[in-house]
Amino acid sequence: GASHIPMIIVPPKNSNYKRNEIKAYLAEINDVYPTILAMANIEKPENITGKNLLELDEERIFYGNSLNKHFCIIKDNIKLIYCSRGDVKLLFDLNEDKMEQHNLINDKNYKHIEEELWKLLIEHTKKYTPELLENDYFITSEPPKNFKDIQNRWFGFHFRDYNVDTFH
């Protein structure tokens, strides 16, 4: 899931990083480790997926993965969600629909964006969790029939309403 909260990072006083800046971009928990390493002048290991937040100066592409079953990508404030349980896609324009109530996956005006985001999501998954793919597509499974099918787990967006995103 995600948290919509501010993140405050204070670099060391004697560093070359700018201070007292406000940046409005998406950050992941994975970004904390490489940011701390950079502030300590330690090179980031190659297998680390996060970014040094003190060096980001452009809008980033955000990738989300929950339980290796639910995935999302956000680019230019367009959010694509994919659930491998049931093989379902959702697409939202966060500029127009901040509450993610209107699924645009079948809107012809967004088809090219959906295809671009899907390609990026597959490439990202191929790089970091290739075991989730088969023939360049996510390995799918049947959606749960009811809440008893999922023990001690998040119900996902198949629980009651297929049209509502709960990847928050």
Q: What residue spans do the PLM features occupy?
A:
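Short acidic (Asp/Glu) and glycine-rich catalytic loops that position anionic groups and cofactors
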Residues: 12-15, 94-100
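Two-metal-ion RNase H-like nuclease active-site motif
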Residues: 61-65
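Substrate-binding rim/cap in mid-to-C-terminal beta-strand-loop elements of soluble/periplasmic
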Residues: 1-58
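Short, acidic/polar N-cap/turn motifs at the starts of alpha helices
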Residues: 50, 69-70
